[in-house]
Amino acid sequence: MRRWNGWGDDATSMNLGEGARAMLAARLGPGLPGQDALRADLLARIPPSRLPEHPLISRESSERLAMALGESYADWIRKRFGALPPVPDGVAYPESGEQVRELLDLAHANRWMVIPFAGGTSVAGHLDCPVSDGPILSVNLTRMNRLLHLDKSSQLATFGAGTPGPLVEAQLRAHGYTLGHFPQSFEYSTVGGWVVTRSSGQQSLRYGRIEALFAGGRMETPVGPLVMPTFPAASAGPDLRELVLGSEGRFGILTEATVRVTPLPEHESFHATFLPDWDRAEAAVRALVQRKLPLSMLRLSNGIETETNLTIAGHERLVGAMEKYLAWRGCSAGKCMLMLGVSSDKRTARHALREARRLLAQYGAVYIGPAMGSKWAANRFKGPYLRNTLWELGYAADT
């Protein structure tokens, strides 16, 4: 079950070893654990709904509370300390674009405020309910979560906007395709949410940011539908897709998103490299990008993040041995970790990795190999779970 006042599934957690705890205490001082607010106390303070009964709308307090907050630091503090914000008066769960249209017509006729909701991972305050004299309706799109159409000829896939990342990939991979969009919130964020927030994924170097992947779709606005055909190009006039990208629900509710997909790569691997310092690391990454090698990912950590990641990883004996080897090779204090990925056919992947290593060596890089990369890939979406662990130890962390 998803945590009501923290990140992710309550069956998943990330532990911090003694080394990581000692580092926190040395850098930040002792933690100050607090007493969390009780969910029951918050629910008891929720005012009655101002919405009438409707078959698509729930007025249950527990559901209204869940829709009122995202995952920003401010949201986190409100949940943990029981600072109850304004909550929606009801939550609708449409299963089709037609039901979204019905809800918007109803809201328009009765002057209700509408806030779209899907993955609930917003960190920019776009789920906040303002103080309002009229009712506020949250429209939860998570039941619109299917692959609606796959055009293999044009490599276009149409999804219900509430389809979360794991379902996007599972439904595409069943047909031999991938979208290749992997934000850190992948576990819960949705394809529609990616579009309306202009999301960037961890492998955007290969597949492109969401604005490059978004080919068209359908948005229901208060005054009618906005249909965006999947024309490959236009020589004149504004691109309606640009109105939707980054719109955060201001113009309407995206109900369908058509995205450009790619056949699954024959080979995919991730590789860890270390560079002596930030200046050389930055220059090396710039050179790699400008060389336009067919890499799928370049993820550079500065010295502090590198030290933190290695400490959090545990395996103190293995990490210690690696640190000694890196120091012997010229990467000691202030070193920066670069994680690079290749996602292509095997021949292209070998060529890209060979050329990348050759270029990186000019900047003093030390290649460690795919073992650390595989470990990173296996845990790539678990980073936000550290927020729960840190809070229990008395530290607050933003995204």
Which residues does each PLM region occupy?
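N-terminal flexible segment immediately upstream of the FAD-binding catalytic core
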Residues: 1-105, 123-155, 307-312, 373-399
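C-terminal substrate-recognition/cap domain of FAD-linked oxidoreductases
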Residues: 53-79, 282-399
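Short, well-ordered beta-strand elements within core beta-sheets of diverse protein domains
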Residues: 90-95, 270-276, 338-342, 399
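Short beta-strand elements
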Residues: 139, 215-219, 242-246, 252-261, ...
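FAD-binding subdomain of flavoenzyme oxidoreductases
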Residues: 145-301
